[in-house]
């Protein structure tokens, strides 16, 4: 059965080290300078406790490095092992992360390779299931090796806010 855990030093740090090493070939394809990625994202996420780990039957199968700024949850890197990369685990992982952090965030942003149709579709379906808005923005940044979209999933604005808050009309 899948589960999501927060990264904790001396509790599951060896699991994270193992899965991180496994993800390095993919990181190297996406980011030309892996040591810069480590300094900018991995190290701060470890120190800030913003790493979530995905397990299936007590075995590590994925992780995400994220940050929260101005109520925006931003995935810096999201990885699930190739053997377990499917709708069940991916959707479960995203939904659990958003559910755990939903009181602290209004939206989720992540970049997705524009040819990764499965990931784009999965992000859209996650937004639908959680009843959130879904938006894609093209990234025009020469530092990225592959063309990517920023995928934004956010809470829907309340319609008729005054009707919800104003009890004097009854």
Give the positions of each predicted feature.
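Conserved beta-strand in the GNAT
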Residues: 53, 59-67, 74-79
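Conserved acetyl-CoA-binding loop-helix of GNAT-fold acetyltransferases
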Residues: 80, 86-99, 121, 125
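Alpha-helical elements of Rossmann-like donor-binding domains used by nucleotide-donor carbohydrate transfer enzymes
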Residues: 18, 22, 40, 92-96
